[in-house]
Amino acid sequence: MSGSDAAELFYDEARFARQGAMPEPVRATLLGKGGVQGLDGEEHRHRKALFVSLMTQDRVVALGTRFGEELAVAATRWRSRSEIVLYDALHEPLARAVCAWAGVPLAETEVRRRTRQLVAMFDAAASIGPRHLRSRLARRRAERWLSNLIHDARVSRIETPPGSALGAIASHRDLGGQPLSLRIAAVELLNVLRPTVAVAVFITFAAHALHLHPEWRARFRAGDDTDLDAFVQEVRRFYPFFPAVAARVRTGFTWRGMHFPKGRRAMLDLFGTDRDARTWSGPDEFRPERFQEDDGGAFGFIPQGGGEAHVHHRCPGEPVTVELMKIAVRFLSTEITYDVPEQDLGIAWSRLPALPHSGMIIRDVRAATTGPRHIL
């Protein structure tokens, strides 16, 4: 299924259900079993409200601020290296930032291990063989880690900052008034941590776009943020992230001459919808200015799901994604300068998540005050 009309149909709860729709290997790695993505109806809306409550404007800005601080610290290390793979280098500052923001204590000795676990859950989830097995193992270990933290929070062994994700999830109660099991609570806390670290994919694509469209970097370097939001949204529209989401037909029906039998798995093409010529003029062109006029609507622009976040299965963390991308674009444009050496910048379409083949290598990183060095 592809296109805004198909997306609107896909998010009709009377016709499609989410429970058990995603393949087991994806649920065992990327999503976790029992999490909000696989719920339906009132149970889904109740659980979703938990996540929406964490995404107030003040909290989103606070996470962005913390990420900016972590980026600045990371960049001091980048400057001591001849070159870095940007995608890989972004994981740790994102993990540090979101754990601090979420109230998840992270000892310095744990940072690398926990970051690897969070990355494995989205970077290797769709692989086969040993990488997929490592993703499953990372999921089990991360759930055990966070289950213990949630238990400690519930018995007041550790303090949870007001408004933190750890505190909110530890104290959340289901529709029956019962606290979430430790494992399900851990799955939901990972649904805060993991996708935040996965924003590294979008930031890598933003750096790719800044390199291929240097006029935009020049505008941001000059301090013109007028179209920063439009630039970030166009990166999210133009570049692939995870390509599709799944549902199962709740009751059989026919739509536009096509029969959907009960129980049939349906896939919504997220990337294809974001490149659909019925919604977007020149969909295969990178044109941020398009967002000055039209945002594609709730079912036409769906890089992280369609509909409304508080009702449908649209990611409630979209404001976080946008904020972190803005922080990163400003940082790459105004805080540091760097060279982009010869490399394979073609998109690895068969990879999930898709990325530039090289991972976006940058070289000779310097503080911006040393003067522009970006090779275009």
Identify the role of each PLM range.
Residues 1-376:
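Cytochrome P450
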